[in-house]
Amino acid sequence: MLFRSLHTHTRARVSYNAHPDASDGTPPDAVFTDPASPLSDGVSKTILPARLPSFPDYRWPAFLQGIIDYGNSPAQRDILLLGAATVLGSTLNKLVSFVYGRKHKYPCLQVFVTAPPASGKGALTWVRRLAEPIHNALLDTYREKIKTYRMEKTKWDTLGKEKANTPEPEQPQLKMLLIAGDNTGTGIQENLMDSGGVGLICETEADTVSTAIGGDHGHWSDLLRKCFDHDRLAYNRRTNHEYRECNVTFLCVLLSGTPAQIKPLKIGRAHV
């Protein structure tokens, strides 16, 4: 799959019965139903959910440990760790790199956290706030620049014949860090190019992204695959003969959703 799916909880919930040992964030009454198969005795069996491994109990750097400690179960602490690493990686982007396979790699992760409803994955909402100060600062800077641009553009429009000797004010680019998942392919490319290839898509409901990708102007799953390898992006508009490109991309993706929300993403082995 395109996204490095990180299953921190059980994969499905079929029916409810008491579960004696649900300490990893799995709903205490979650069970699985094993359907009858030709090799069985023809009777469906109820089995307990498999215990997926969690990260060892390391002592992480203080600022990261403070985030992880808010988790009330091993699974939720894993969610906070992975989410924080993804969001913080988006803020580091091009500042940190290493060479792997003769290519430069950056701390730009694409993470999908899947879990049953009401199992704690909503904690990613709080992790997203780590990037909001930078995002808001970029927007504030843009608002100041666009205000100045409009004033200069108004003056330039009144110059009359002197326009020929005076360069037209250049409109500032809208730089941001947080990119909306409900977006078109061209929209995301523009967001990335305006921001030097840097961006973070963070959505707590995977349906937001799957709906956008499946829309008439969506189909940007290929863009995600390119950004995973930090490949260049480019597009050409015939209407105004505009060509834009971005040589290196630093896009991070952090999604969460239920197991049922994975399939609508329409990203399978053929896209690996």
Role assignments for model-derived ranges:
Residues 1-2:
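Short, small-residue-biased leader/transition segments that mark boundaries at the very start
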